[in-house]
Structure formats: structure tokens, C-alpha cells
């Protein structure tokens, strides 16, 4: 998956991210800046999931939006 593409299109993808993770605030999504590790951290923080689970969710999101 291409995180450079996601980062470059992050403003357009913020709605997708908020749709997938409704607990993320606008600030959370903005602060993630389309970077995988930042988004993983935000998902972990808001949902209280382990890092590997947050990574799995973020990778699934990336695969879906990179089509």
C-alpha cells in the first residue's frame, strides 16, 4: 500500500477515516496527517486496542482507499 499517496490525498480522505473510526475527533484526523504510525496511535488511543489490532485496521483502511 502506498502511504505517500494517502498522505498526499489526506485532506480528501479525512471523511473516510472519520467514517471508519467514528470516535476520532477532527483534531485526531488532522494530527494524523496521513501518516500510518500517527493514525495507528490515534486509533489505539480512542479505541483502547492493542497496537497490532490498530495496525490491522489502519492497513485495511489503506488497502480500501488505495484502490
Annotate each predicted stretch with a short phrase.
Residues 1-67:
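Intrinsically disordered, low-complexity, hydrophilic segments
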